């Protein structure tokens, strides 16, 4: 059932936790999963309140919420069931879940919701459930109340310990004393023993240290002291001291006890004497006895009282001592805990500081990384943009574009377009703003280039000799005067103040950098006032609390100027509202008491008594209000408090600020409050903005001068963050130690200590924020104090305090000296200015007053310029007054005096020597002319920028169009054709011709004709494609793009000309109104007919002149002049003529003529306007003389007019109306007497009118020259742009023609190559196998595709093994193996039968090819000799060994290789059966592999070489495997024993032992007998009889000798041959002693028995192995029998059959009968 429920929960419901039957009870013990199941069935609506925790509260909550839902489903669920589930009772959760599963399935079938089920339930059940739940709830509440009452009762019970009896106490104390004594004795004995051992060790160490002193000195620094017994010795010594002290105390107590006993004894003696005396007195009367008894009783009571009082005093003393000791212990514990807490807090502070430092470093890194990434992106954008335009412009990027991109890159603006600047966009995005910024930057740069005539607008070669127009200084002066008249407040001169010797500065630094300490030291040595902002704020608040009244008069206007911030706060109500009337913040949790105080303050502030307070008290009130509201004091309020304090300091006294300002805003406010920096800077900036840019006044500078700083010096006490934290910790540590030391001593100064404690806590809490705030604000402050003038001095504050103070004092003394020198220099400059300015001030006082009051006002405002005019006009007046000349002589005298200064020529208008006319003008005129000029300037600049922007965009469009034209034409040339289809069809037909017809002449002729037809068809295709390409080029040329582009470009340049003409017209109008107003004339009416520069009409539509605002010029003129124009030879077309391009050039010349005509028209319009203005001046002058003739009827007026005309002659261009100027003296009939004053006034007016006219015309002519120059520049620029555009377009058209011709020639050449290839194959009568590819202009033979398959290559024959040097082939070996396996399956055969078989195979079966030819000449003696070499126990032969030997050559295995092969076989033999299959055999491999380097022959008909080693590996498995099993099994140990054979008999035995044991067995020392045997064997060697084998035998002997030498040299380790060997393994190694009658194939049932078994058993028993258990190899090898057996055992000797074969061949060769093998050897 549990599995069903788990499947239902995990798969169907998929609850949040996987449920298994083992953890079923635990999973549902908290009720969360039950709630989740009900929630999935929409029954548990409050499932969000369930908890997954396994706490008791969570379980109670979950099951309380589950109960009504389970009852709703009709399940039985109460406290017992819940407790069973909570306690994980087996089966409880399963039972409930099963019931829930059934109930939910029923609900699922009915389809009812939880609410419907609840409504369908009877009301009785619901009522019962509610009663049960209420009863349970009441029961829980009662139980809880009862538990609380019992807990209170238990807590109220006082546990009184039961006193112990005196006897038990004394016994326990006695036991404790005995125990302590015993422990002391034990410790003393141990100490004595330990000291004795220490002395011995020290003696030994001293003796050793003398011998190894040098090595100890070298290694002591490197070794670690892992164990030290100093602490242990100290503890023992301390304990000994304590024991000695205890003994002394015990002696004292014993002595005190003896003294007490002695005193008690004396008391007893005295009592005894008294008793004796009493007894004697008792003899007296009864009354005396009663008296004595009473006295004795009183005495006893007195004694008792005395003892009680002594006992109480002792108790009091013990209590005081205990309290004192407890206080000391408590203080020590508190100090220790405080130190621990302080260390932890310090560590936390350091961690927080390091974390903040890391965060700041990360922020800086991210910021720098972002900047670098942004720069890198912009560099990539620039590179890609350059690459794109190199592609567009053929690597010839225009200089203007590159310059614009560099500007954008240096400005950090993206080069690529972020978004399109549409006009309908209402809300600009970030990309939109970036595009607008980029556009504005490029527009401004283009405008500056145009204005300054640099860059793209630099003067061309034609205008290099002509000088550019100069600045119109007259217009600049006029505009400046108008601006000053319009804004007179900007020209008011400020009152200068006398410089002060007081030094002003501030000292800044991090928290606890030593600012206050340094200032205290500085204050002791210098008369300097220190201002601390914290102290000033506290004093201001205190002044408010004390209601300090203002004892000073109201501030004057000068004070208002010096301190605008304070006075604004004092006077302005709006600022009071902004600063003080702060609405309460909703998050502020102020108490009602604070609210009442704030309301009281508001009422007090609104009263009249608040205004009577001093300024400091008012500022303190505002500060307190901000602090009460939980806000910081604003910077402006702090600066006001500080400035108010500075005002109270005497002017000549120096002052220094302590730690202020700390932010840039505070520094700016302080600078503004002390110097008015911001107000003056804004005035200068506003004046600079109002300055005209098109015309400048050379006498005024537009640069904003930097104002001096309010401070003379700023000192930074530089310390590191760690030093600040360390100083904070030191202060807090001292405070903690001070608190602990004075905690219990009367507690003096509790309030002060509490304040210091709160300050230290506040310091510690805010030290991190203060440091971070300083680090954030200091870079801006450093820039503020070093930018205009470097007044900052950094001092390292981490040095000694006295040295730091000394450094600061030196800096202050230096600043004091510098300030004194500066003040003296300023005073000297002012004195020199006064002396120099005194003489020019006298002539105006001596000169007579002017005629009008306006000129007097002009004198007051412009003191210098009128002075020059007055000095010129004073001399004739002085002569007229002081000379007393008659009235008739005065004009003569003036006429005579005027031509006298002929040496210096009169200054020209606009030069530096020219004195500008500054006659008064109407007050309302500047208010009209200044906005009018601003409109002129703004419209001119915007017009120029817009046109230049369109020209810039036009350049981009031209490049894009030309690139698209080139690429589209190239794609058109590369459009696909159908030539390949014809070529493929021809190739298929050509290859399908039968081979027997290739040599037929008619066939060849037919094929040649087909080639000609193919060529003609391909030629037709090329011709058609060429005609289509030419038509496409002609269509591109005939497009109207070039004409439209030229027309648009011309219109842009015409717009530039229009802008210049408009500027000139507006400037002329402004100058005309200005000078006419100066002459008190009425301005002329505004003529609305402005000159319009015509534009080019782009489309051919005819529009009436009434519908046009701007005149249009038709594109192509129908006049005979345009039709007769011939193109200039060599202008654009070079080489052969091209009619379409000639038409383009003709159109360009027409456009060039239109451009020149338009320029000439604009230039002529400007000249006409100047001429009209001059004519108007002359006309007005002609009209004015009749008005003057009524007053001036003397002939001298004619002379004056002639003089005026002589002055005006060089200034005019046309002098056609001189007759009119001479008509005035004709009208004079009778002279009238004129007074000298009237004469002087008339002369002055005439001179003024002449100067106004001269200045006006000079300004107008300067503007005309500038406009004409600009028009000339625009004309040349337009011509160069249009010529460049036409040149680029014609180059593209020519390039298209070049591509077309080149492609056509390439296609024809490809067709020619194809024809030659086809004719070659026809003549050579060969097919074309590879595909011929002819597409577009490419022709080649595709070597990857063949149209018909190649003939199949011949198959290579299989490899065949050949006989070489008498070696048996693999086939021969397999045949011999099969025959021997049939005869002797066990591998052992009789030697007689073996030799007979070999003889029969050699002599009788000659056609079977069982042996090579070299074996056919073996005699019976040779075969018997071979048999004797293979004989085992003189009777049998191992035919497997024979086949292994005859299979040579194969690589002889070394002992290590055999062991490695054995380990690989064992690793694959997982069952350790000793056998493996063929697959495992191939996987493990032998010591040699069959992967030989086989050379594949080049001839495909030649077979591959035979891989003999690979076949040998397979043959060895067939040779040694047991084929009777399925699959065949190989005994790998037995096989490796065969391969252990060695030419050296002894070595072969040891190799076999190593293979059997599985590890290397070292050889024992050889005996002389063994050496003798080897010598005898070597003497029998037949090498001497056969000289042919001498060399090979000598080589083998040499190898054997080297191997023996190696074995001799091999060192035998001590633990060598310790491996154990068993009896079975030993019998397996020496298996040659098996007596087996295996002469025929029917003897397999016979049992084998080893002849060495009995001897081995005896050997094992001799060596101690009674039960024949395995023994060590080294022990076994020491036994004499084993040594003798190893020395004489020859089964592991590798027989040398090759020697017998060579001897047989040698014998045959001597008889003249050569074997086939020798013949083959000789041939080779």
UniProtKB/Swiss-Prot annotation:
The encoding gene: Spef2
Subunit details? Interacts (via C-terminus) with IFT20. Interacts with DYNC1I2.
Where do the Calponin-homology (CH) domain residues begin and end? 1-105
Which region ranges are annotated with the description Disordered? Answer: 545-576, 828-910, 1177-1241, 1580-1618, 1704-1724
What Gene3D superfamilies does the entry give? Calponin-like domain, P-loop containing nucleotide triphosphate hydrolases
Annotated tissue distribution: Highly expressed in testis, where it primarily localizes to late spermatocytes, round spermatids and elongating spermatids (at protein level). Found in Sertoli cells of the testis (at protein level). Expressed at lower levels in epididymis (at protein level). Detected in lung, brain, liver and kidney. Also detected in bone, cartilage, trachea, pituitary gland and eye. Expressed in osteoblasts and chondrocytes.
Intrachain S-S bonds: none
Protein name per the record:
Sperm flagellar protein 2
BP term (GO), one? mucociliary clearance
Q: Where is the composition biased (Basic and acidic residues)?
A: 558-576, 853-862, 1177-1194, 1592-1607
* Task of the protein: Required for correct axoneme development in spermatozoa. Important for normal development of the manchette and sperm head morphology. Essential for male fertility. Plays a role in localization of the intraflagellar transport protein IFT20 to the manchette, suggesting function as an adapter for dynein-mediated protein transport during spermatogenesis. Also plays a role in bone growth where it seems to be required for normal osteoblast differentiation.
Chain coiled-coil ranges: 170-203, 255-351, 665-691, 995-1021
Superkingdom in the source lineage: Eukaryota
The cellular location(s) given in this protein's UniProt record come to: Cell projection, Cilium, Flagellum; Cytoplasm; Cytoplasm, Cytoskeleton; Golgi apparatus
Q: Where is the composition biased (Basic residues)?
A: 1210-1221
Q: Which effects follow disruption of this gene? A: Lethality occurs at approximately 3 weeks of age, accompanied by severe hydrocephaly. Weight at birth is similar to wild type but subsequently there is significant growth retardation. Bone mineralization is reduced in the vertebral column and hindlimbs, associated with decreased bone strength. Bone length and skull thickness is also slightly reduced. Trabecular bone density is reduced, along with reduced trabecular number and increased open porosity. Expression of the osteoblast marker genes RUNX2, BGLAP/OCN and COL1A1/COL1 is reduced in bone tissue.
Q: Which UniProt keywords are present, listed alphabetically? A: Cell projection, Cilium, Coiled coil, Cytoplasm, Cytoskeleton, Differentiation, Flagellum, Golgi apparatus, Spermatogenesis
Query: Which Pfam families does this chain map to?
Result: ADK, CH_2, SPEF2_C, SPEF2_D5
Q: Which SUPFAM superfamilies match?
A: EF-hand (SSF47473), P-loop containing nucleoside triphosphate hydrolases (SSF52540)
Q: Where is this region: Interaction with IFT20?
A: 1228-1580
| A cellular component annotation (GO) from this entry | Golgi apparatus
């Amino acid at each position: 059932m549990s599995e069903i429920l788990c499947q239902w929960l995990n798969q169907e419901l998929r609850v949040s936790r996987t449920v298994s039957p083992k953890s079923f009870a635990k999973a549902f013990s908290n009720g969360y999963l039950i709630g989740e199941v009900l929630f999935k069935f929409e029954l548990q609506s409050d499932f969000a309140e369930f908890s997954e925790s396994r706490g008791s509260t969570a379980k109670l909550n979950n099951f309380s919420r589950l109960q009504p839902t389970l009852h709703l489903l009709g399940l039985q669920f109460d406290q017992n069931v819940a407790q069973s589930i909570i306690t994980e009772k087996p089966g409880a959760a399963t039972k409930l879940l099963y019931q829930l599963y059934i109930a939910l399935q029923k609900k699922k079938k009915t389809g009812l919701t939880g609410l419907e089920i609840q409504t369908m339930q009877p009301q009785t059940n619901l009522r019962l459930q509610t009663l049960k739940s209420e009863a349970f709830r009441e029961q829980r509440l009662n139980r809880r109340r009862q538990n609380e009452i019992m807990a209170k009762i238990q807590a109220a019970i006082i546990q009184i310990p039961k006193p112990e009896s005196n006897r038990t106490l004394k016994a326990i104390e006695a036991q404790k004393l005995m125990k302590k004594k015993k422990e002391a004795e034990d410790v003393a004995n141990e100490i004595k023993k330990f000291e004795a051992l220490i002395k011995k060790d020290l003696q030994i160490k001293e003796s050793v240290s003398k011998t190894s002193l040098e090595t100890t000195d070298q290694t002591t620094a490197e070794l670690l002291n892992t164990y030290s017994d100093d602490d242990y010795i100290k503890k023992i010594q301390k304990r000994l001291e304590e024991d000695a002290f205890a003994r002394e105390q015990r002696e004292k107590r014993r002595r005190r006890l003896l003294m007490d006993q002695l005193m008690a004894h004396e008391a007893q003696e005295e009592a005894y004497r008294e008793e004796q005396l009493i007894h004697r007195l008792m003899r007296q009367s009864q009354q005396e006895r009663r008296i004595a008894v009473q006295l004795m009783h009183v005495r006893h009571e007195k004694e008792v009282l005395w003892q009680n009082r002594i006992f109480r005093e002792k108790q009091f003393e013990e209590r005081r001592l205990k309290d004192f000791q407890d206080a000391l212990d408590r203080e020590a514990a508190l100090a220790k805990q405080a130190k621990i807490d302080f260390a932890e807090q310090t560590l936390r502070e350091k961690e927080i500081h390091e974390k903040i430092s890391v965060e700041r470093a990360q922020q800086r890194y991210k910021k720098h990384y972002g900047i670098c990434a942004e720069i890198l992106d912009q560099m990539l954008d620039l590179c890609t943009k350059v690459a794109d335009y190199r592609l567009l412009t053929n690597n010839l990027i225009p200089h203007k574009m590159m310059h614009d991109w560099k500007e954008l890159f240096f400005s950090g603006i993206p080069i690529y377009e972020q978004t399109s600047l549409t006009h309908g966009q209402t809300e600009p995005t970030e990309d939109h703003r970036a595009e607008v910024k980029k556009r504005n930057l490029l527009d401004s740069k283009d405008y500056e280039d145009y204005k300054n005539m640099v860059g793209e607008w630099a003067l061309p070669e034609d205008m290099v000799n002509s000088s550019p127009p100069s600045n119109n200084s007259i217009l600049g002066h006029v505009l400046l005067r108008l601006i000053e008249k319009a804004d007179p407040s900007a020209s008011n001169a400020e009152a200068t103040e006398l410089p002060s010797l007081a030094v002003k500065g501030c000292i800044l630094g991090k928290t606890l950098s030593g600012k206050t300490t340094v200032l205290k030291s500085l204050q002791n040595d210098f008369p300097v006032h220190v201002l601390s902002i914290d102290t000033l704020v506290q004093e201001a608040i205190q002044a408010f609390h004390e209601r300090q009244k203002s004892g000073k008069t109201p501030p004057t206007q000068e004070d208002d100027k010096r301190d605008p911030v304070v006075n604004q706060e004092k006077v302005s109500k709006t600022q009071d509202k902004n600063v003080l009337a702060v609405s309460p913040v909703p998050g502020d949790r102020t108490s009602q008491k604070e609210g009442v105080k704030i309301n009281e303050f508001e009422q007090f502030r609104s009263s009249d008594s608040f205004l009577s307070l001093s300024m400091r008290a008012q500022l303190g009130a505002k500060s307190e209000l901000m602090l009460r509201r939980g806000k910081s004091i604003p910077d402006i309020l702090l600066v006001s408090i500080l400035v108010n304090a500075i005002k109270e300091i005497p002017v000549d006294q120096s002052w220094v600020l302590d730690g202020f300002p700390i932010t840039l805003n505070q520094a700016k406010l302080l600078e503004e409050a002390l110097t008015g920096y911001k107000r003056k800077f804004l005035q200068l900036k506003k004046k600079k903005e109002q300055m005209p840019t098109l015309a400048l006044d050379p006498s005024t500078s537009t640069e904003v001068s930097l104002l001096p700083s309010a401070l003379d010096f700023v000192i930074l006490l530089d310390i590191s963050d760690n030093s600040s934290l360390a100083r904070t910790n030191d202060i807090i540590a001292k405070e903690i130690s001070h608190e602990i030391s004075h905690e219990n001593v009367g507690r003096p100064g509790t309030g002060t200590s509490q304040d210091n404690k709160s300050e230290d806590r506040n310091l510690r809490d805010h030290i991190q924020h203060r440091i971070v705030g300083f680090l954030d604000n200091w870079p801006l402050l450093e820039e503020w104090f070093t930018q205009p003038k470097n007044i900052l001095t950094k001092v390292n504050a981490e040095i000694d305090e006295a040295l730091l103070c000394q450094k600061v004092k030196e800096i202050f003394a230096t600043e004091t000296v510098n300030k004194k020198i500066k003040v003296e220099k300023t005073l000297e400059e002012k004195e020199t200015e006064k002396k120099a300015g005194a003489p020019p001030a006298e002539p105006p006082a001596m000169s007579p007053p002017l005629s009008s009051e306006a000129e007097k006002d002009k004198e007051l405002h412009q003191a210098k310029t009128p002075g020059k005019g007055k000095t010129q006009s004073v001399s004739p007046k002085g002569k007229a007054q002081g000379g007393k000349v008659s009235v008739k002589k005065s004009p003569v005298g003036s006429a005579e005096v005027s031509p006298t200064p002929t040496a210096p020529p009169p200054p020209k208008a606009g030069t530096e020597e020219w004195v500008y006319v500054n006659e008064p003008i109407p007050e309302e005129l500047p208010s009209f002319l200044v906005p009018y000029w601003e409109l002129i300037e703004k419209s001119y600049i915007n017009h120029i920028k817009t046109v230049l922007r369109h020209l810039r965009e036009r350049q981009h469009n031209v490049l894009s169009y030309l690139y698209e034209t080139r690429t589209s034409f190239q794609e058109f040339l590369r459009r696909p054709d159908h030539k390949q289809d014809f070529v493929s069809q021809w190739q298929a037909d050509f290859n399908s011709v039968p081979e027997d017809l290739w040599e037929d002449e008619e066939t060849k002729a037919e094929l040649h004709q087909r080639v000609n037809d193919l060529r003609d068809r391909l030629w037709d295709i090329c011709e058609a494609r060429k005609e289509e390409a030419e038509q496409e080029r002609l269509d591109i040329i005939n497009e109207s793009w070039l004409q439209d582009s030229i027309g648009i470009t011309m219109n842009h340049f015409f717009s530039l000309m229009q802008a210049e003409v408009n500027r000139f017209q507006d400037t002329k109008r402004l100058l005309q109104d200005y000078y006419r107003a100066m002459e008190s004339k009425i301005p002329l009416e505004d003529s609305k007919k402005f000159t319009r520069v015509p534009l080019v009409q782009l489309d051919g539509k005819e529009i009436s002149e009434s519908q046009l605002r701007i005149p249009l010029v038709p594109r192509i003129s129908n006049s005979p002049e345009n039709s007769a124009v011939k193109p200039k030879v060599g202008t654009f077309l070079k080489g052969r003529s091209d009619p379409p391009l000639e038409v383009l050039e003709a159109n360009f010349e027409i456009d060039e003529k239109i451009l020149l005509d338009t320029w000439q028209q604009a230039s002529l319009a400007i000249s006409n306007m100047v001429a009209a203005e001059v004519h108007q001046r002359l006309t007005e002058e002609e009209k004015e003389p009749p008005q003057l003739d009524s007053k001036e009827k003397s002939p001298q007026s004619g002379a004056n007019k002639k003089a005026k005309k002589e002055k005006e002659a060089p200034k005019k261009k046309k002098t056609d109306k001189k007759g009119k100027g001479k008509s005035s003296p004709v009208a004079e009939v009778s002279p009238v007497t004129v007074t000298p004053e009237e004469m002087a006034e008339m002369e002055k007016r005439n001179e003024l009118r002449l100067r106004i006219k001269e200045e006006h015309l000079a300004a107008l002519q300067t503007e005309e020259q500038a406009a004409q120059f600009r028009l000339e520049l625009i004309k040349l620029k337009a011509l160069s742009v249009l010529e460049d555009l036409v040149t680029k377009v014609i180059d593209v058209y020519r390039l298209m023609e070049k591509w077309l011709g080149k492609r056509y020639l390439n296609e024809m050449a490809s067709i020619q190559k194809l024809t030659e290839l086809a004719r070659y194959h026809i003549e050579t009568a060969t097919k074309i196998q590879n595909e011929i590819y002819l597409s577009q202009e490419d022709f080649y033979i595709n070597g990857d595709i063949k149209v018909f398959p190649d003939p199949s290559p011949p198959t290579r024959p299989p490899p065949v093994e050949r006989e070489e040097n008498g070696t048996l082939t693999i086939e021969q070996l397999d045949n011999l193996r099969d025959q021997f396996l049939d005869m002797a399956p066990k591998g052992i055969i009789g030697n007689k039968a073996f030799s007979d078989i070999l003889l029969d195979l050699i002599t009788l079966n000659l056609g079977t090819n069982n042996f090579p030819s070299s074996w056919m000449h073996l005699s019976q003696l040779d075969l018997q000799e071979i048999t004797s070499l293979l004989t085992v126990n003189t009777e049998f032969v191992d035919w497997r060994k024979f086949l292994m030997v005859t299979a040579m050559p194969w690589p002889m295995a070394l002992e290590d290789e055999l062991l490695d092969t054995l380990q690989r076989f064992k690793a694959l033999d997982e069952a350790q059966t000793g056998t493996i299959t063929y697959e495992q055999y191939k996987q493990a491999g032998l010591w040699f592999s069959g992967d030989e380097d086989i050379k594949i022959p080049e001839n495909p008909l030649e077979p591959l070489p035979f891989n003999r080693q690979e076949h040998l590996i397979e043959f060895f498995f067939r040779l040694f495997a047991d084929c009777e099993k399925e699959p065949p099994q190989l005994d790998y140990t037995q096989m490796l024993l065969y391969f252990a054979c060695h030419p050296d008999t002894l070595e072969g035995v040891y190799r076999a032992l190593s293979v059997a044991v599985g590890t290397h067995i070292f050889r024992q020392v050889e005996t002389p007998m063994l050496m003798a045997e080897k010598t005898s064997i070597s003497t029998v060697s037949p090498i001497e009889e056969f000289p042919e084998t001498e060399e090979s035998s000598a080589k083998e002997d040499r190898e054997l000798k080297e191997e023996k030498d190696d074995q001799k040299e091999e060192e035998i380790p001590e633990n060598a041959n310790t491996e154990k060997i068993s009896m079975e393994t030993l019998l397996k190694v020496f298996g040659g002693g098996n007596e087996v009658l295996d002469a025929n194939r029917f003897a397999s049932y016979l049992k084998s028995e080893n002849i060495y078994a009995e001897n081995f058993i005896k050997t094992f028993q001799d060596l101690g192995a009674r039960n024949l258990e395995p023994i060590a190899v080294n022990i076994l090898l020491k036994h004499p029998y084993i040594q003798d057996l190893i020395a004489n055992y020859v089964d592991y000797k590798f027989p040398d059959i090759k020697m017998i074969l060579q001897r047989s061949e040698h014998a045959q060769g001597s008889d003249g009968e050569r074997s086939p093998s020798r013949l083959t050897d000789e041939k080779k």
